[in-house]
From Swiss-Prot:
Keyword flag RNA-binding: yes
Gene (UniProt): cas5d
Species of provenance: Thermus thermophilus (strain ATCC BAA-163 / DSM 7039 / HB27)
Key word Nucleotide-binding present: no
Name of this protein: CRISPR pre-crRNA endoribonuclease Cas5d
EC number(s) recorded for this UniProt protein: 3.1.-.-
Domain of life: Bacteria
Key words, A-Z: Antiviral defense, Endonuclease, Hydrolase, Nuclease, Plasmid, RNA-binding
Length: 229
């Protein structure tokens, strides 16, 4: 594996807490899955995965109430008129944020090229500001900017207990529960369901540490069910 470090920032961010069902309320820091999404936006290949190790808070951001238009229906196989499902909801978002993301790039079993090849491609894109698709801070309307770390360090006096936080979604292959169709790297499309995984999040001395054992739980759910399918 290889360690990556990226600075990300933006004018607005919203990393939604799941316990607020109607209105969106943001965590003060990206969830591990949101941080992974930022890295995948910069560079992604099916031959490797990112494991986020920790997230540093450079600028905590100011809570800001924002009225947004959202669609109340989930996208399904059948089309629907957006205007019929549009809703106005208040979101408590963050204004003016910046973070450091540290993660490991880990090869998947079917990879044929060495890890340094992908690491060099990532670092090259990071320095040039290139990306696979537009990175965003929690929601697509809040674009993210990124660069190599510039020496700025997290606030060592910042300590927060954030409570339960979404770690990631485990896409469990299960033909007996075909709620979703998704792709498995190196195998194509399969059917199954998404299972959310949580952990108790704490910011200590400006850093949110991501428990490494959660990745093992994620892989057991995804790969274990695939082997038994």
């Amino acid at each position: 594996m290889a360690r990556l470090k990226v600075k990300v920032w933006g004018e607005y961010a919203c990393f939604s807490r799941p316990e607020f069902k109607v209105e969106r309320v943001s965590y003060p820091v990206p969830t591990p899955s949101a941080a992974r999404g930022l890295l995948e936006a910069i560079f992604w290949k099916p031959e490797f995965r990112y494991e986020v190790r920790r997230i540093g808070v450079l600028r905590l951001g100011t809570p800001f109430a924002l009225l947004r238009n959202e669609v109340g229906n989930r996208m399904g196989a059948k089309p629907f008129f957006v205007e019929d499902a549009r809703q106005q909801r208040t979101s408590l978002v963050l204004k003016d944020v910046a973070y450091l993301v540290e993660a490991d790039m880990v090869l998947r079993p079917h990879a044929t090229d060495p890890l340094p090849k992908y690491l060099e491609q990532f670092e090259r894109r990071l320095k040039k500001g290139q990306y696979h698709h537009t990175p965003y801070l929690g929601t697509r309307e809040f674009p993210a900017y990124f660069s190599p770390p510039d020496g700025e360090v997290p606030d060592g006096g910042l300590n927060l207990d954030l409570g339960p936080m979404l770690f990631d979604l485990a896409f469990v292959e299960d033909p007996g529960r075909p709620e979703l169709t998704f792709k498995r790297p190196g195998r194509g499309e399969v059917q199954g369901y998404a299972l959310p995984l949580f952990f108790h999040a704490r910011i200590r001395e400006g850093w949110l540490e991501v428990p490494a054992e959660k990745y093992q739980e994620l892989y057991r759910l995804e790969e274990g069910h695939a082997k038994g399918a």
